[in-house]
Amino acid sequence: MTEHNHDAELTINNEEELLTLYDENGNEVLYRKMLEFYHPEFKKEYVVLAEEGAQSDDEDMIELVPMINEPDESGDGGKLVPIETDEEWDMIEEVVNTEINE
C-alpha cells in the first residue's frame, strides 16, 4: 500500500488498483480500489472498493465498499477489516462525496 506521513492532515491516494477478495461463500471477487486515504483524527488508513464490472443502478449509483486497511509489520499491505463506528461511516461518506465532486 501507499506510505503516508501520518502526522499530516488527511492524505488521499486515488490511484486505482485491482484486489481479489473472497465473499461469504469463499468465491473470489475482483474489486477495484477507488480511493485510499489516511485520516489523522482516526489514525487509520481506509480504502474504498467497488466490485470490478459492477453496473450502476437506476440512479447511476455503484455500491462502494469502504474498509480499514491494517498494515502489516513492514507497512506493506496488511488486512482489510470492516468499518467500526458510525463516526467513521460519516467521515468516509464525506470524503467520498468530496472526492467525487472534484
UniProtKB/Swiss-Prot annotation:
InterPro entries from the UniProt entry: UPF0473 (IPR009711)
Source taxon at top rank: Bacteria
Signal peptide interval: none
HAMAP family with a match to the protein in the record: UPF0473
Family in the record: Belongs to the UPF0473 family.
Protein name per UniProt: UPF0473 protein SERP1179
Organism: Staphylococcus epidermidis (strain ATCC 35984 / DSM 28319 / BCRC 17069 / CCUG 31568 / BM 3577 / RP62A)
Top-level taxonomy: Bacteria, Bacillati, Bacillota, Bacilli, Bacillales
